[in-house]
Amino acid sequence: MVLIRVLANLLILQLSYAQKSSELVIGGDECNINEHPFLVLVYYDDYQCGGTLLNEEWVLTAAHCNGKDMEIYLGVHSKKVPNKDVQRRVPKEKFFCDSSKTYTKWNKDIMLIRLDRPVRKSAHIAPLSLPSSPPSVGSVCRVMGWGTITSPQETYPDVPHCANINLLDYEVCRAAYAGLPATSRTLCAGILEGGKDSCVGDSGGPLICNGQFQGIVSWGGDPCAQPREPGVCTNVFDHLDWIKGIIAGNTDVTCPL
């Protein structure tokens, strides 16, 4: 009965979702159903985001995905025909880089969510490890999510789409977007010639480079996937001490400047 209620709620959310958000994968293909057991679907205030399961109690996503009445779904592939092992959770606690929950396009767009109860691992639910080494420019990266697959007109898929993009030099993003500082805790990821990118609805989801979880999708150009307008992601490696500290119960830990 509980599972039936969860699946019904997911279908209702799919039908009521207003197709508004901050980032979706352009130029990709349907993800393999078995390649994203760590990918979570976040609904809030009629918006949609992605996120990443770190362990049975914690999800990492973008700070700008914070909202009221958040619902977190795990084990999802098709939203219309859910897997039997889909699980629904809500936040027990949320943690931000500072108490004011402030962030900018180049700093602190990161949020840790402690779930209301532990997740049960299953065929379609498993955590993703934090990175063991820093990201390297030139890496091939995988981006994924249920975001729009067309831009500027928005077309939202039933299943997550995945695309391979490259980790670019930060100066490429500085040239594309006025106002970015000389240094930041972000990554620049995309295809120089355009055609592939995260987009509206993908925010908060993972950027996986050479097999390691290196970024959190944050923002990008509008329309998405334009030449020399890559996506910008929060650098996970730069925030490892904060992430590990919060999970360990040290709420006094601070984010890097």
UniProtKB/Swiss-Prot annotation:
User: Where, by residue number, is the active site?
Assistant: H64 (charge relay system), D109 (charge relay system), S203 (charge relay system)
Q: Which GO terms describe its molecular function?
A: serine-type endopeptidase activity; toxin activity
Q: Which UniProt keywords apply?
A: Disulfide bond, Fibrinogenolytic toxin, Hemostasis impairing toxin, Hydrolase, Hypotensive agent, Protease, Secreted, Serine protease, Signal, Toxin, Zymogen
Domain Peptidase S1, by residue range, is: 25-248
CDD domains to which the protein is assigned, alphabetical: Tryp_SPc
One Pfam short name = Trypsin
Indicate the principal place this protein occupies in or around the cell.
secreted
What are the EC numbers? Answer: 3.4.21.-
Propeptide residue interval(s): 19-24
* Secretion signal span: 1-18
Q: What SUPFAM superfamilies does UniProt report for this protein, alphabetically?
A: Trypsin-like serine proteases (SSF50494)
Temperature-related activity notes? Heat-stable to about 95 degrees Celsius.
Asked if the Swiss-Prot or TrEMBL record annotates the protein with the keyword 4Fe-4S, the reply is no
Task: Give the intrachain disulfide bonds.
Answer: C31-C162, C49-C65, C97-C255, C141-C209, C173-C188, C199-C224
Which body tissues produce this protein?
Expressed by the venom gland.
| Domain of life according to the entry | Eukaryota
Q: Biological process GO terms, please?
A: proteolysis; regulation of blood pressure
Output the SMART domains linked to this UniProt entry: Tryp_SPc
Task: Give the family this protein belongs to, as stated in its UniProt record.
Answer: Belongs to the peptidase S1 family. Snake venom subfamily.
Q: What PANTHER family does its record include?
A: KALLIKREIN-1, KALLIKREIN-RELATED
Q: Briefly, what is this protein's role?
A: Snake venom serine protease with strong beta-fibrinogenolytic activities, angiotensin I (AGT)-degrading activities and strong kallikrein-like activities in vitro, releasing bradykinin from kininogen (KNG1). Intravenous injection strongly lowers blood pressure in experimental rats, which may be explained by the action on angiotensin I and kininogen.
Q: Which miscellaneous remark does the UniProt record hold?
A: Negative results: does not have activity on gamma-chains of fibrinogen (FGG), and does not coagulate human plasma. Does not induce or inhibit platelet aggregation.
Quaternary structure (record): Monomer.
What is the official name of this protein in its record? Beta-fibrinogenase mucrofibrase-1
> Which source organism does the UniProt entry give?
Protobothrops mucrosquamatus (Taiwan habu)
